[in-house]
């Protein structure tokens, strides 16, 4: 028993036999913590269980958790490939007790697993405990029979774990193995502890305290256990190798890389094979869990991982996209343990292929510039920070990629100068922003918010309300009143008007009082909770301190509500049809239509669009209630509500749920559950109808779907029906047959165009205009020179190729004159004459007569063009003269 898959199974089976629930790995995108970039430890999915927020139907658990450390605090990216154990993706095996067993059983279970199940040599094992954790030290002596010198007390934070400044915390005990004196290094706590001889492979965390505030801890009434074992490290130990990259799983991936590049994974480029193998795992699992390459957040980290691997593929000589060809090997090795890899295999492959294709242009350009800039630098020197910043800012070449490219040559980067250049750019942007007047306006809103307080929003329950005017703004400054005919910004104590946010547009309506009538043309939110109404006074005066009645445009609000609820249904339908990688990237909810931007690497096909539309309408027709609850944010996320990464949520959030669906386990579940501050319909049936009206690209890896609901959808479909009837009338067929008839007509047109093109080509090769000789000899070389009309440039090239074949040895010059009088020119030289004649030089001689500039191509075939087709014969004469002079 030493294969990675077998080790994983042995661990989970062992703890299952000891009463632990085997819990599947949670996704790499944390469900219960929108502030965490990636899942980076086994305990992440149990965070709310440890804190008491969430209850589970079990008190013991075991997992094999997929983890990524490649961004923020936990970032191993730069070291990957150059050390024996650094990874961006790794698996953490862990067992957990939620107030059930504690230190005695935790240590006993760990000891029996490593010595009896895994069969490790007891004489090579040693442990660390926290400096004053006498209980753990006593238990290790009792259970393992360790002498005092093999129980090392550590007083640093390495052996005391805490979740944050507050919350559960406790001492740790780490298990080490002595890999032998042939490796440099000393035991933990010694000056040589960073060496490879003593390898830590399992950390046991004893959560026995709660930290109320820094320095103030109290005992937990029910202590818990959290452990983490690196699967890759344990595999290396059991397989008797000193590097994780020499284990069976990594050898399979590295061998697949070697097969693609056609060279063995040895020598100076070993690190490149390791980088590709590691990054392939990270990239594939991230895509499978819904992350796609982008320019911010998780998508940016994924892009960095992908591009670093792709640069190393280029170093190994790969000239075409290669990463996607490795995916089947990864799926074969890990797909049984992680079925999501199997389900997402085609998505992973396509994402890698597209990203590598795009990146090659950036890579080639950036490396060319980097080579030129570092040609005179030697080992130990630094590339200037200004140059590194130019590569980043102008050519899209990230700093870490520049550093990685120079690492093998021992050249560094002046990162301080890079940061200074970055800060100068930011300062310039801030100055430009301040100069635009926006900074002064923002200062106004901060001061106003401080003085009048937050606006109370009543719009979830009401569309009319009374409020007191607390501030008026006109031309960027506060005023006491707005007169009839004036426009400005209105702040009131409370309002039913929704302020634009979360993609939903602001409400419109009216403001009224005795002798006052004003229109609200838009509503926005400033600083999160200050509602600002754009008003135009039509009659009377609007003054600070005045009591007013505010009335929302009901019909417009109803249309917005329908579109917003439809957005939620479409979001979940997209996830179910396309996959779990779908995540919201932006939205717009208006009375007329909705648009929803989401992560997806390629265009949706017609069947996918139809399936999404059908699913959303099926849930709509259930006419189920749309339920809104106020919940603590942790409770909301623990229930499965979708939150946006990076979004700042308050302590209390609105959770909007709608529809029913059948889950994969056959149980009924809520179709859509999202954190949302917008306005929604009361029942899904009020949406009326959802029709998708468009799908397209927004950015790399981001698609946009557009749809209409209710009356807007009905009007759209009626107009589409009228257009279809008009087209069918022109085609003289029933509407149901219009598409087939149109397709047949288009194919007929294409056939006729092909036939016409062929006829023109044959006519052109069959003879020229007046005064042209089909073939003549110039300077001992056969020259075929012709001018033709109505032949496109691509056909001129094929004519030149055909002419070269007819001549066997010679030069072909053809001018094609278009109907608008412009001309194209092609010159071909047979291979036996390219040492004497250059087609590029000949074509340039002719293009001058056509009014063109230059021309380009190869010695055997070149092309040019010009605006003066009337000079076709002059161009041919110039080519003949150039040929004679050559």
Curated annotation (Swiss-Prot):
- The UniProt entry lists the main location of this chain as cytoplasm
- What's the domain of life for this entry? Bacteria
Q: Which residues bind Zn(2+)?
A: 564, 568, 676, 680
Q: Which SMART domains match?
A: tRNA_SAD
Q: Return the domain comment text from this UniProt entry.
A: Consists of three domains; the N-terminal catalytic domain, the editing domain and the C-terminal C-Ala domain. The editing domain removes incorrectly charged amino acids, while the C-Ala domain, along with tRNA(Ala), serves as a bridge to cooperatively bring together the editing and aminoacylation centers thus stimulating deacylation of misacylated tRNAs.
- Subcellular location(s) per record: Cytoplasm
Query: What are the record's GO terms for cellular component?
Result: cytosol
Any one Pfam family match given in the protein's UniProt record, by short name: tRNA-synt_2c
Gene Ontology MF terms: alanine-tRNA ligase activity; aminoacyl-tRNA deacylase activity; ATP binding; tRNA binding; zinc ion binding
This protein's cofactor list reads: Zn(2+)
Question: Could you tell me what the cofactor note in this record states?
Answer: Binds 1 zinc ion per subunit.
SUPFAM superfamilies with a match to the protein in the record: Class II aaRS and biotin synthetases, Putative anticodon-binding domain of alanyl-tRNA synthetase (AlaRS), ThrRS/AlaRS common domain, Translation proteins
Q: What is this protein called?
A: Alanine--tRNA ligase
């Amino acid at each position: 028993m030493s294969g990675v898959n077998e080790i994983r199974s042995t661990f989970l089976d062992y703890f299952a036999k000891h009463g632990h629930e085997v819990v599947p790995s949670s996704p790499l995108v944390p469900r219960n913590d929108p502030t965490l970039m990636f899942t980076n430890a086994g305990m992440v999915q149990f965070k709310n269980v440890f804190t008491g927020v969430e209850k589970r139907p079990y008190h013991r658990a075991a997992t094999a958790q997929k983890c990524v450390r490649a961004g923020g605090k936990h970032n191993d990216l730069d070291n990957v490939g150059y050390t024996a154990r650094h990874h961006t993706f790794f698996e953490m095996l862990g067992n957990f007790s939620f107030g059930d067993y504690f230190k005695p059983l935790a240590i006993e279970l760990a000891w029996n697993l490593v010595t009896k199940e895994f069969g490790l040599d007891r004489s090579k094992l040693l442990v660390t405990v926290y400096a004053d954790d006498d209980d753990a030290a006593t238990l290790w002596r009792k259970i393992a029979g360790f002498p005092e010198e093999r129980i090392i007390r550590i007083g640093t934070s390495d052996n005391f774990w805490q979740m944050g400044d507050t919350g559960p915390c406790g001492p740790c005990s780490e298990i080490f193995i002595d890999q032998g004196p042939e490796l440099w290094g000393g035991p933990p706590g010694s000056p040589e502890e960073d060496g490879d001889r003593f390898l830590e492979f399992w950390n046991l965390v004893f959560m026995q305290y709660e930290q109320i505030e820094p320095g103030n801890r109290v005992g937990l009434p029910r202590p818990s256990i959290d452990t983490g074992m690196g699967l890759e490290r344990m595999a290396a130990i059991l397989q008797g190798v000193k590097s994780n990259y020499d284990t069976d799983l990594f050898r399979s991936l590295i061998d697949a890389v070697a097969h693609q590049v056609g060279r063995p994974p040895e020598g100076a480029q070993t690190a490149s094979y390791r980088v590709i193998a590691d990054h392939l795992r990270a990239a594939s699992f991230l895509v499978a869990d819904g992350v796609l390459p982008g320019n911010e957040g998780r998508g940016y980290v994924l892009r960095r991982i992908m591009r670093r691997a792709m640069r190393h593929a280029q170093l190994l000589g790969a000239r075409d996209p290669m990463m996607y060809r490795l995916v089947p090997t990864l799926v074969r090795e890990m797909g049984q343990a992680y079925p999501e890899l199997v389900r997402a295999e085609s998505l992973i492959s396509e994402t890698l292929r597209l990203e590598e294709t795009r990146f090659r242009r950036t890579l080639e350009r950036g490396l060319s510039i980097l080579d030129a800039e570092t040609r005179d630098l030697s080992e130990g020197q630094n590339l200037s920070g200004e140059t590194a910043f130019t590569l980043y800012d102008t050519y899209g070449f990230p700093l870490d990629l520049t550093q990685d490219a120079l690492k093998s040559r021992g050249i560094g980067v002046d990162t301080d100068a890079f940061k200074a250049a970055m800060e100068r750019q930011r300062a310039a942007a801030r100055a430009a922003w301040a100069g635009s007047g926006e900074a002064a306006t923002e200062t106004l809103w901060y001061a106003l918010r401080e003085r009048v307080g937050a606006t109370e929003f009543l719009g979830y329950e009401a569309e009319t309300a009374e409020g007191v005017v607390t501030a008026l703004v006109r031309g960027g400054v506060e005023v006491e009143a707005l007169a009839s005919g004036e426009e400005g910004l209105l702040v009131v104590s409370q309002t039913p008007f929704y302020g634009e946010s979360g993609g939903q547009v602001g409400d419109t309506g009216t403001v009224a009082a005795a002798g006052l009538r004003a229109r609200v043309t838009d509503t926005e939110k400033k600083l999160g909770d200050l509602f600002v109404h754009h008003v135009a006074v039509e009659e009377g005066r609007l003054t600070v301190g005045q009591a007013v009645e505010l009335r929302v445009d009901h019909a417009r609000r109803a249309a917005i509500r329908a579109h917003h609820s439809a957005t939620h249904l479409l979001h979940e339908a997209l996830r179910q049809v396309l996959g779990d990688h779908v995540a919201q990237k932006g939205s717009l909810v208006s009375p007329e239509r909705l648009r929803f931007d989401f992560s997806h690497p390629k265009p949706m096909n017609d069947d996918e669009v139809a399936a999404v539309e059908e699913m959303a309408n099926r849930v709509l027709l259930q006419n189920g209630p749309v339920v809104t609850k106020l919940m603590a944010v942790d409770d909301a996320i623990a229930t499965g509500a979708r939150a946006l990464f990076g979004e700042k949520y308050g302590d209390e959030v609105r959770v909007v749920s709608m529809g029913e669906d059948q889950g994969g386990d056959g149980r009924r579940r809520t179709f859509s559950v999202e954190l949302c501050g917008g306005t929604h319909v009361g029942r899904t049936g009020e949406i009326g109808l959802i029709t998708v009206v468009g799908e397209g690209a927004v950015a790399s890896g981001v698609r946009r779907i557009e749809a209409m609901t209710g009356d807007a959808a009905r009007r759209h479909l009626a107009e589409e029906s009228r257009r279809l009837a008009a087209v069918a009338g022109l085609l003289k067929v029933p509407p149901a047959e219009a598409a087939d008839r149109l397709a047949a007509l288009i194919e007929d047109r294409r056939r006729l165009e092909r036939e016409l093109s062929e006829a023109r080509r044959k006519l052109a090769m069959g003879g020229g205009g007046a005064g042209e000789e089909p073939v003549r000899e110039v300077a001992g070389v056969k020259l075929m020179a012709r001018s033709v009309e109505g032949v496109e440039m691509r056909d001129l090239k094929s004519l030149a190729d055909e002419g070269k074949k007819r001549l066997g040895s010679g030069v072909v010059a053809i001018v094609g004159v278009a109907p608008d009088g412009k001309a194209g020119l092609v010159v071909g030289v047979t291979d036996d004459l390219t040492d004497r004649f250059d087609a590029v030089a000949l074509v340039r001689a002719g293009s001058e007569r056509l009014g063109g500039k230059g021309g380009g191509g190869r010695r055997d075939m070149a092309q040019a063009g010009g605006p003066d087709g009337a000079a076709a014969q002059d161009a041919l004469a110039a080519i003949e003269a150039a040929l004679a002079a050559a």
